[in-house]
Amino acid sequence: MLSAIVRSSVAALATLLLSGLGSAGGIHEVHMSNDQSVQAQEQATRVVIDRFNDAFNRHDADALAALLTEDTVFEDTSPQPDGKRIEGKAAVVEFWRGWFTRNADAHFDAEDIIVSGSRATVLWVYRKMRNGQPWHLRGVDVFTVREGKVAAKFAYVKG
């Protein structure tokens, strides 16, 4: 009985291979194509995140605006405990303009950027002067990128 099942399975596999699914254009190539598609999406996501971080550190609200979807959502780290949710490109850009004015010396250093498809997690250190002394805070941003723009940015901090 077992040898009949094995023979049947081998025959089915041989039929599959001979039908062209195992050759060019078949299963292996589809798998590679999917890997390449995911890799391309992750590269595109990384480019958007790098551009966002660069514009942020230049305090360039107009450059940030160009990187946001119209329905973008930003969740700030304050007020504690849950932060403030800001919805829509215009409101988010207005928030950042004010933030840049209040934090003219602020700089974010990305320690690590982890990309998975259209999502990215950025581990960062926020640095500025506070009361004349260097000060820093560590945190994480979770981004969602859609069609080459930031659709969501959720910020979390330690402490």
Model-derived features with residue positions:
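Bacterial N-terminal signal peptides that target proteins for export
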Residues: M1-V10
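Bacterial N-terminal signal peptides
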Residues: S9-G20
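Short beta-strand edge/turn micro-motifs at domain boundaries
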Residues: I27-V30, H136-G159
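Hydrophobic pocket/interface hotspot
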Residues: F52, L64, T72, G88, ...
